[in-house]
Every structure is written in structure tokens, then in C-alpha cells.
UniProtKB/Swiss-Prot annotation:
The keyword Hydrolase applies. Belongs to the HAD-like hydrolase superfamily. SerB family. The keyword Transmembrane does not apply. Gene3D superfamilies: HAD superfamily/HAD-like, SG protein - dephosphorylation function. This is Inhibition of morphological differentiation protein. GO terms for molecular function: hydrolase activity; metal ion binding.
């Protein structure tokens, strides 16, 4: 599937991975909804709505307009949430919640890319409080995600500084390539969503993973490889055992509140329910 070990006399390369339904089997942020409830960040009603949103997300996800509306909704809902508390909740529950839903196929690909000498970069609309710990768990070198403003009191102000979605993901990849010396024509990218077409077409070796219908059509039209990941498994249970080689500290290129992304999908669930009614 992959090219051999990198020729280090050539420019560096990287593999860019979307996170939800590409590396892990569920929405990373929605997976923490029960933990956020137990920590007092959301109420019981919101927990039920996030469960519904998880179902909707797995069934097909949100389109561009819905995701744009999520951005406005999440910023309002998360205003005043303590960032350190969110980080602590994620740290306490990360292995129990995320480890079991990592795709075995994705973990193998990450190993192969590292063995070949490529950097691994997680590129996600979800947040630093979720994505950075998952990146460390996987041995990723860098994380690109959305960024919300944090006030002097350590809480979200409700303002979105940077939204890692659609074309902005591709822009971040190009900026990272310029700063790190990646040759994008020889880089890889993986995603499940048609909203990530700009990211996929920014590299020379794009791959559709568990694609939604729109991305499947695009991949077939462009001749992009289509991969089927369907085996979530705990990393420590993989055979041979998954091992993360010693690597420099993960670099967060950008970040967002995990709770904020959860709130966005709560909004999406409400919208879908209203349409059905």
C-alpha cells in the first residue's frame, strides 16, 4: 500500500489523517459527553442529545452549511467553560473511551508511515483537549485543529479564533509544509468526509477512508484509493503489539475546546430532529 522507506536526500514528507471515522470509529468529542456530564459541564438533556448526534454522525455526518452553523452555536454554548477542567476530564477517561475505538487498520498505517520516515499529522475539526491526547496516544508528530479564544480566567470567551474545517485544513497543511519542508506531491492524506476534499487534493497521494457518499463519488471519479477500516481494537491488544517509537513532543499547530465541538454536534442533532418533525 505504501511506498518504501523515504530517501532522506529528498524533501521531507508526511501523512495527514482526519480523526473521526478515519482513525477512530466514532466522534472523538461526542465520546466524552458522559464524562462532561459527570464533570458538570453539560446537563442530562445534553447527554441524550449527544447520543442522538453520535448516531446521526455515524450515519452520515453533517454537510457544509450545517457545520458552519455549528461553529456559531458551539461558541455561544461553551462560553465560560473552564479549559483546565475539560483537559482533566479527558486525561482521566482517555484510555477507557478512546483506546477501544481506534481502528486497527489506521494504527497499522501510522506505524508504516513512521517506519518509512514520514511525519504523522492529525488534522481535525475537534479540539486540542481531545485531539492532542489522542495524537500522543497514537504517536503523532503534530496536530492541526480549531482554536477558540481563552480568557485571562482560563475559560472560553465564546470567540472562535480559527476553524479547522474544509479549505482551512488545506491552508494549514500548506503552511505546515512550507515551515517543515514537506513535499506535498509525495505526501499522503486520509479522510472519510467530502468536506475534506480540499485537504485530500492538496497532497499527491489522497485516500478516502470509510467515505460518505459524496466523497465516494469524488474518489471514484478521481481514481483515489478507497480504504475500508472496520476493526476497532485496543492498541495493546494488537498483534504484533502496537508500539510508539520515542518521538519529539507532539506539536499542536492549532486547537479548539473539546466541549465546543461536542456542542456543535448537539446543535446538529436538534436541527435534524426538527426537520424530521
Amino acid at each position: 500500500m505504501l511506498k518504501g522507506v523515504e530517501n532522506h536526500s529528498l524533501p521531507r514528507t508526511a501523512a495527514f489523517f482526519d480523526l473521526d471515522k478515519t482513525v477512530i470509529a466514532k466522534s472523538s468529542t461526542l465520546t466524552f459527553s458522559k464524562s462532561f456530564y459527570q464533570g458538570g459541564l453539560i446537563n442530562r438533556r445534553a447527554v441524550l442529545r449527544t447520543a442522538y448526534a453520535q448516531f446521526v454522525f455515524l450515519a452520515g455526518g453533517a454537510d457544509h452549511d450545517q457545520m458552519e452553523r455549528m461553529r456559531a452555536y458551539l461558541s455561544a454554548l461553551c462560553r465560560g467553560w473552564n479549559v483546565q477542567q475539560v483537559k482533566e476530564i479527558v486525561a482521566e477517561t482517555l484510555h477507557d473511551l478512546i483506546d477501544p475505538i481506534i481502528y486497527d487498520e489506521a494504527a497499522s498505517l501510522i506505524e508504516e508511515h513512521h517506519t518509512a520516515g514520514r511525519d504523522v499529522v492529525i488534522v481535525s475539526t475537534s479540539g486540542a483537549e481531545v485531539v492532542e491526547p489522542i495524537g500522543e496516544l497514537l504517536g503523532a508528530d503534530r496536530v492541526v485543529a480549531t482554536r477558540m479564544v481563552v480568557g485571562d480566567d482560563g475559560c472560553f470567551t465564546g470567540e472562535v479564533e480559527y476553524y479547522a474545517y474544509g479549505p482551512t485544513k488545506a491552508e494549514a497543511i500548506r503552511e505546515l509544509a512550507a515551515s517543515e519542508g514537506y513535499d506535498l506531491s509525495r505526501c499522503y492524506a486520509y479522510s472519510d468526509s467530502a468536506t475534506d476534499v480540499p485537504m485530500l487534493e492538496s497532497v499527491g497521494r489522497p485516500h478516502a477512508v470509510n467515505p460518505d457518499r459524496a466523497l465516494r463519488r469524488e474518489a471514484l471519479a478521481r481514481g483515489w484509493p478507497i480504504l475500508d477500516f472496520h476493526r476497532p481494537v485496543r492498541l495493546k491488544q494488537r498483534i504484533p503489539g502496537f508500539s510508539v517509537p520515542p518521538r519529539p513532543a507532539l506539536v499542536a499547530v492549532a486547537a479548539i475546546g473539546a466541549a465546543a465541538a461536542t456542542a456543535g454536534l448537539v446543535w446538529y442533532a436538534n436541527r435534524r430532529r426538527a426537520n424530521v418533525a
